[in-house]
């Protein structure tokens, strides 16, 4: 069941306690058979709005949203939410260009939460648990949700939290490094957050995944015009 992530008020205070969220909403939904998955409905609103509301409720500062593909339509779906929206003109070059653009736009901070826009089950509680885990991480470590089977890593989840030191590395060499490269090449930098919460692992990349998650087949009438 998809949780209702429509809070009435933000949880943050004037003091910045949480990482700055960066929501990656520039992708082309290439496996969705012509649908822009970010505009398909979750709990009656476009998925990108659903996820943005979750991050906005958790964060102390307006999340940074990186737009790209169908930027006008996605921006319209986010109307009325306190966000910092930017457009990545290089979005077709891959996800890391959007990560870099978001990190630059976010400016200096202690930590950043890099979040995908197709996580329909992600909740404020998931974000808070990830943030709590990150406080136990070592200096310079990246906190990553992980699910284990038989004591072994079965899969990594999203969002992840990166510190300022990783931000500098990614901005300097995003094309060759990136979050995945940083994690694969430097496993010592990973601080694993063991969690079985579906919010970290259920994403929507295909029409079948949308149907499995919502119980509905995607339809052109569902998307925002």
Please report, for each region that a protein language model flagged, where it lies by residue.
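Alpha-helical elements of Rossmann-like donor-binding domains used by nucleotide-donor carbohydrate transfer enzymes
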Residues: 50, 73, 97-101, 129, ...
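N-terminal glycine-rich phosphate-binding loop and ensuing alpha1 helix
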Residues: 16-69, 75
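Short, structured coil segments at secondary-structure junctions
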Residues: 35, 59, 79-82, 186
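Conserved alpha/beta core of the MobA/IspD/sugar-nucleotide pyrophosphorylase nucleotidyltransferase superfamily
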Residues: 2-21, 168, 174-225
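Structured catalytic cores of enzymes that bind and process phosphorylated ligands/cofactors
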Residues: 2, 27, 50, 63, ...
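Conserved beta-strand segments of alpha/beta enzyme cores
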Residues: 38, 62, 84, 189-191, ...
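Conserved donor nucleotide-binding strand/loop of the catalytic core
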Residues: 82-93
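Conserved beta-loop-beta/alpha segment of the NTase-like Rossmann-fold superfamily
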Residues: 92-164, 168-169
């Amino acid at each position: 069941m998809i949780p209702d992530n429509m809070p009435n008020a933000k949880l943050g205070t004037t003091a910045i306690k949480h990482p700055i969220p960066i929501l990656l909403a520039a992708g082309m939904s290439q496996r969705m058979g012509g649908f822009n998955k970010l505009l398909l409905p979750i709990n009656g609103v476009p998925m990108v709005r659903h996820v943005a509301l979750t991050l906005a409720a958790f964060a102390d500062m307006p999340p940074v949203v990186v737009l790209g593909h169908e930027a006008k339509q996605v921006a319209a779906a986010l109307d009325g939410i306190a966000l910092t929206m930017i457009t990545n003109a290089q979005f077709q070059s891959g996800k890391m260009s959007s990560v870099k653009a978001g990190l630059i736009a976010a400016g200096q901070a202690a930590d950043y939460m890099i979040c995908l826009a197709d996580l329909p089950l992600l909740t404020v509680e998931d974000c808070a648990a990830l943030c709590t885990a990150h406080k136990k991480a070592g200096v310079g470590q990246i906190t990553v949700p992980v699910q284990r089977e038989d004591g072994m890593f079965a899969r990594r989840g999203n969002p992840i939290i990166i510190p300022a030191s990783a931000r500098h590395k990614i901005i300097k060499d995003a094309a060759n490094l990136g979050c995945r490269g940083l994690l694969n090449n430097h496993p010592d930098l990973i601080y694993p957050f063991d969690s079985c919460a579906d919010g970290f692992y259920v994403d929507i990349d295909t029409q079948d995944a949308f149907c499995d998650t919502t119980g509905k087949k995607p339809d052109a009438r569902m998307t925002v015009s």
